[in-house]
């Protein structure tokens, strides 16, 4: 591993506390990923990135800032990357997936806040996440009450911009989201000092569409009865996609897809024939939250799809590239992003439709619907999700968890029993 200590000091990180966080990462990566047999060779790229997750990309971002580019840290798949890229800005994800950050978050937030929100705030306040230290602006959105209030804390020492996501999907809501995107574009122009033109936005839309297509290719390979890659490896790929340079992400995902397609042609599977196929749905899973996938795939099943923000919601549906004016392009962006079926919407029948479609496409034997503890939206929506799946004859297991390992054995027992039931 390269030595990034000087870089971390220069951006004001608490290096000693950060060392404590980093000490557990090699063991976790080894247990979850490197211990797997017969992995695709293309996963070497993601293994390298995760081994230096707080070094490689942060160093690149700092070098780009020296050239005058601005970095925007985002929390949600509803923030349109295309707008930032069109102004020569850079988008990065932010830290939010480790129990390590939760105590620092609980120092200022209620304990009854979801772990993702507590970890986000804790990562920033503890000065142990380089992405929070580097970002010139944070961009939030109104998809969650916990995040909305957390943004007020996060915005105390770094500029914070919040996009107002409509809570319904009527024609007027899509038009209103288009106006929100246009307003965001003005703010991005102000921060970067660069004007967004039709041509620049067209290039950015195409760039992100190509990234979506590449990730879709990887997911399409998981529809095969011959399963060429584990769910854990795909989860890692998509988690890193939130941070990586989009052109490089596209290249690497296409390289992985090429290998997976070759594996399918040659009958190379990572699981024995007859392994039960699981779709995981619910709350997002940020780095390094691999707990559920690890338990499922070491309990005799395989994860073949994730209907979540760190899954299909991130890449399904392309933006229409035919817009001739900024107004048309903003509407095309609005129409695409409003197809993302987040639990913040009411009604949210689109998510049910997506799940029923994916069960067929990915040849799913059972669904695991998971919510983070105190995530009211996904916890409440479990009722209609479970009912719809059961009516369609699809076995479903509903779970609630957090980032701690204290419930790991309980989860293993319940998931193991669910997998046994699928074999009955």
Sequence positions of predicted segments:
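A short, acidic, amphipathic alpha-helical segment used as a generic capping/interface helix at domain edges
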Residues: 124, 346-363, 380-381
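Acidic/His-rich segments in extracytoplasmic proteins that coordinate ligands and/or metal ions
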Residues: 122-187
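Acidic beta-strand-to-loop metal/phosphate-binding motif
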Residues: 134-142, 364-373
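A charged, amphipathic alpha-helical module
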Residues: 2-70, 182, 186-315, 348
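Redox- and metal-dependent alpha/beta enzyme cores, enriched for Fe-S-associated oxidoreductases
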Residues: 66, 78, 83-96, 104-105, ...
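Peripheral docking tails and interdomain loops at the edges
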Residues: 2-9, 383-424
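An N-terminal, globular interaction/scaffold subdomain
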Residues: 54, 62, 69-125
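Short, acidic/turn-prone active-site loops that include or flank metal/cofactor-
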Residues: 95-101, 164-169, 307-311, 402-403
């Amino acid at each position: 591993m390269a030595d990034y200590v000087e870089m971390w000091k220069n951006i004001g990180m608490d290096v000693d506390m950060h060392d404590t966080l980093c000490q557990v990462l090699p063991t976790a990566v080894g247990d979850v990923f490197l211990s797997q047999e017969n992995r695709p060779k293309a996963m070497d790229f993601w293994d390298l990135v995760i081994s230096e997750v707080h070094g490689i990309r942060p160093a690149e971002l700092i070098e780009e800032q020296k050239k005058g580019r601005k970095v925007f840290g985002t929390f949600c798949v509803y923030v349109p990357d295309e707008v930032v890229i069109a102004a020569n800005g850079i988008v990065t994800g932010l830290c939010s997936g480790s129990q390590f950050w939760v105590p620092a978050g609980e120092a200022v937030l209620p304990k009854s806040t979801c772990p993702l929100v507590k970890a986000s705030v804790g990562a920033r306040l503890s000065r142990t996440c380089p992405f929070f230290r580097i970002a010139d602006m944070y961009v939030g959105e109104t998809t969650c009450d916990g995040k909305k209030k957390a943004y007020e804390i996060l915005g105390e020492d770094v500029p914070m911009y919040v996009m107002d996501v409509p809570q319904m999907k009527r024609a007027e809501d899509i038009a209103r989201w288009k106006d929100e995107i246009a307003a965001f574009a003005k703010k991005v122009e102000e921060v970067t000092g660069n004007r967004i033109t039709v041509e620049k936005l067209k290039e950015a839309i195409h760039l992100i569409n190509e990234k979506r297509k590449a990730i879709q290719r990887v997911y399409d390979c998981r529809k095969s009865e011959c399963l060429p890659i584990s769910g854990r490896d795909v989860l890692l790929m998509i988690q890193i996609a939130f941070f990586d340079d989009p052109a490089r992400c596209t290249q690497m995902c296409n390289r992985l897809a090429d290998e997976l397609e070759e594996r399918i042609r040659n009958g190379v599977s990572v699981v024995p024939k007859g392994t039960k196929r699981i779709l995981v749905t619910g709350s997002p899973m940020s780095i390094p939250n691999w707990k559920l996938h690890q338990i499922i795939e070491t309990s005799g099943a395989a994860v073949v799809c994730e209907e979540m923000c760190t899954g299909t919601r991130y890449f399904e549906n392309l933006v229409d590239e035919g817009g001739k004016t900024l107004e048309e392009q903003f509407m095309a962006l609005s129409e695409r992003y409003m197809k993302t079926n987040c639990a913040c919407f009411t009604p949210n029948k689109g998510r049910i439709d997506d799940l029923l479609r994916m069960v067929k496409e990915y040849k799913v034997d059972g669904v695991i619907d998971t919510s983070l503890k105190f995530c009211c939206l996904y916890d409440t929506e479990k009722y209609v999700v479970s009912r719809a799946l059961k009516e369609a004859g699809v076995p479903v297991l509903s779970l609630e968890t957090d980032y701690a390992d204290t419930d790991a054995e309980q989860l293993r027992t319940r998931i193991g029993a669910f997998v046994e039931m699928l074999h009955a």
